Amino acid sequence: FQPSLVLDTAKILLDNYTFPESLMG
């Protein structure tokens, strides 16, 4: 179990989730 891996995955998921919102304004 690697906490850093989980944090990186969570960050990627959050980035992918918020990107369309920021793109739409």
Swiss-Prot record:
GO terms for cellular component: extracellular region; interphotoreceptor matrix. Its main location: secreted. Coiled coil: none annotated. GO terms for molecular function: retinal binding. Keywords: Extracellular matrix, Secreted, Transport, Vitamin A. It is found in: Secreted, Extracellular space, Extracellular matrix, Interphotoreceptor matrix. IRBP shuttles 11-cis and all trans retinoids between the retinol isomerase in the pigment epithelium and the visual pigments in the photoreceptor cells of the retina. This is Retinol-binding protein 3. It comes from Sus scrofa (Pig). The gene is RBP3.
